[in-house]
């Protein structure tokens, strides 16, 4: 499961977007001014403009993985490109560690990308004439690092992503999953604080995609990066995210934790994604537990489960108990009780 973002880290917004718009078309700025920020995608389309991002405001906290999810054309990749300034916004403000991204000079922007941002895209974009090691070392050499230092760092990254033994292979000798590992290692070689990933696994076969998701979660557990991850796959979003932002027609329909989105979809559009989601695979014990109330220790089972544990991982153990199970926090303090009836209802109540 994704890492949990502490309340302390939530105070530190690494990325902040304030009323960001991206509208394509010759009359984009004029149309936006005329609309006074109340953008109607159909009206803009009739005027020859395409709305990519419509008044996006949110923050991404230190160490958080925010997954931006939506169907094709929803604006999710455009939003990522605005935040990395691969695409210029039409209006709004973007801040990276409190600095105004849109006010940076070209030199400052290049320096920011080289030292603070790592990017991975659906296309592996490996250099075919370079080996695994040379591909990983390439951004370090562009920065001006020595060949020796670059190669030593590349060796570390190759080992980190499970490519040790294949350092001297060329891209054509690797599978799709292995090629994407090279792309991931290359993006991490510069030790970025912020990691942008735009549908990095969507071109892979389902089994390889699952393997890469597992690897990605392992890496995040080790590196604790601030991540903006784009996908069109709701299951992938649920599996990876600390929070999910669901987009439609350039608008963020809802931004919340996976559990809250499944339990409390904000719009009918969001609800369509959540209807078929098995609740036990998403919800944790905290989201379905009851208060202790008048329950005494003798009324409780000896079994204890973490409040962060996903129901699917503990349901068998909970259902084997005759008494309510204590739900505990990271300090082993009892914060609630999980009743068998709640778990049974979650598993079978809507079937």
PLM features: what roles do these ranges have?
Residues 16, 33-42, 99-100, 141, ...:
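Conserved ABC ATPase "signature" region
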Residues 84:
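Helix-to-loop junction immediately C-terminal to a conserved catalytic motif
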Residues 249-250:
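Conserved ABC ATPase "signature" C-loop
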Residues 170-174, 178:
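Conserved ABC ATPase signature
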Residues 255-256, 264, 337:
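ABC ATPase "signature
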Residues 298-323, 327-330, 338-351:
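The conserved cystathionine-beta-synthase
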Residues 189-193:
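A short, proline-enriched helix->beta-strand linker immediately N-terminal to the Walker B motif
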Residues 92-100:
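Conserved ABC transporter NBD signature motif
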